[in-house]
A protein has these predicted regions:
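Active-site helix/loop module of the DD-peptidase/beta-lactamase fold
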Residues: 125, 144-186, 219, 244-284, ...
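Structured C-terminal helix/loop/strand segments within mature extracytoplasmic catalytic/sensor domains
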Residues: 21-34, 352-401
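Active-site Gly/Thr loop motif
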Residues: 264-272, 318-369
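Catalytic-site signature segments of enzymes, centered on catalytic residues
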Residues: 114, 120-121, 186-188, 196-275
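Active-site-proximal alpha-helical segments within enzyme catalytic domains
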Residues: 234-241, 285-306, 358-374
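Active-site-proximal loop and beta-strand segments within enzyme catalytic domains
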Residues: 78-92, 108, 119-121, 141-227
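N-terminal leader/targeting segments and the immediately adjacent pre-domain N-terminus
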Residues: 16-119, 147, 176, 180, ...
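Active-site SXXK
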Residues: 107, 125-150, 174, 238-242, ...
């Protein structure tokens, strides 16, 4: 199976393969199997850099005038301690299966590292960092009056959710992962879990959207607003609310409201979560961008929504989305959760987090943004070590403040 997939991946990612497209390029057995193997631990360093050759996409157009970030000429080095052992930067990069690392401090790039064949033009999958992007778009739509209130019920914008698990839930509930919908987010895609069912039908076989599942099959488990339950389904429904409220494709709205005015350097793109004729942006986990543009996005949020001299995102929204009262998400889970941003205990720091250890880590106290793009064998579990590294970077800058 691995040999067959390697051969398929090579053919998919080669320039010659793009010249001979079949009549239905996204639903051939080869393409379906390619999407089915995207998390393969021996090849995810490659697939995570080439999602547009495995999935149907929608492009988010960049600015013609990029936001220039000065680059520090001095070499960057840092060490950190984890579980009683101290590691150098190079050891961290290898130990945590790093594809790319960017560190911005005081509006300047102080470290920019590419690995595993990637470069400044590579567009990396965000996985669930996309939730923080979708939240940002919701905030902009709210400021424009396209969404009247985040306390509006989901069914006001998506009447097809009447009678589903989302009836009675509000936009705020979805932003905070408290919809009350019965959903179990377990990343074992070879086992018959709820997430596997929706993932395989939406992202692999292209049979229906995440929002189709939400409307037709979701069920209520708890009262909305009462219990934190991390859910890519909630974030996907948020994206469907967004596109319905603004009356535009999500990619076009993002280009117009964020990617162009913020001075992003290169086009980004969303992978699609359904069949080609009706599929739309996979708002829960499907954005792709360059390392620097992820850094620009994090820097914009650090700046209170400001980018290259322009106020792109309302500052009040940024404060609400990333701050507030820190409340742990559960027993043994010290991180909190605001509007699709994770918060850090005893700190003003917050972060966007994606599967297989993708991070945009923002520390307001030291004016630092860290982007870490990975291809770890395990989908989750290494966050404590990453937080130890981020803490060491922040401590390094705190000494120079």
């Amino acid at each position: 199976m691995l040999f067959a997939f390697v051969a398929a991946a090579i053919s998919l990612l080669s320039p010659c393969a793009a010249t001979a497209q079949p009549s239905s390029p996204w639903t051939t057995p080869t393409m379906i199997e390619g999407r089915n193997q995207v998390f393969h631990p021996g090849l995810n360093f490659l697939t995570f850099q080439h999602m547009d050759q495995l999935f149907a996409t929608r492009v988010v157009r960049a600015s013609g005038k990029p936001w220039i970030l000065p680059k520090e000429q001095e070499s960057f080095d840092v060490s950190y301690t984890y579980e009683g052992k101290t590691y150098a930067l190079d050891q961290f990069l290898e130990k945590t299966s790093t594809n790319a690392l960017l560190v911005i401090n005081n509006q300047r790039i102080v470290a920019e590292i590419y690995r595993n064949g990637s470069n400044e033009e590579t567009r990396f999958i965000s996985w669930s960092m996309a939730k923080s992007i979708t939240s940002t778009l919701i905030g902009i739509a709210l400021s424009e009056g396209k969404i009247e209130s985040i306390d509006d019920p989901v069914t006001k914008y998506l009447p097809e959710m009447e009678g589903s698990g989302y009836q009675g839930a509000t936009i705020r509930h979805l932003l905070m992962m408290r919809s009350g919908v019965d959903w179990l987010e377990i990343y074992r895609f070879k086992e018959p879990t709820q997430l596997t069912e929706v993932h395989d039908n939406s992202l692999v076989a292209y049979k229906y959207r995440f929002c189709d599942y939400a409307a037709k099959q979701s069920m209520r488990k708890t009262a909305p607003g009462t219990e934190f339950n991390y859910s890519t389904l909630d974030a996907s429904v948020l994206g469907c609310i967004l596109e319905r409220a603004v009356g535009m494709k999500g990619a076009d709205y993002m280009a117009e409201k964020v990617w162009k005015p913020a001075g992003m350097e290169r086009d980004g793109y969303w992978i699609m979560d359904g069949p080609p004729e009706v599929g739309r942006e996979f708002f829960g986990a499907g954005f792709n961008a360059t390392l620097r543009d992820y850094g620009r996005f994090g820097l914009m949020i650090l700046n209170g929504g400001g980018a290259d001299g322009k106020q792109v995102v309302p500052i009040d929204w940024v404060k609400q989305a990333t701050g507030g009262v820190h409340e742990p998400t559960g027993p043994g889970r010290p991180t909190g959760y605001q509007y699709d941003w994770w918060t850090i205990p005893d700190s003003k720091a917050f972060m966007a987090v994606g599967l297989h250890h993708q991070f945009i880590y923002v520390d307001p106290d030291t004016h630092t943004v860290i982007v870490k793009l990975s291809a770890t064998p395990k989908p989750v579990g290494d966050q404590p070590e990453h937080l130890a590294f981020f803490g060491a970077v922040v401590a390094k800058f705190a000494k120079t403040q």
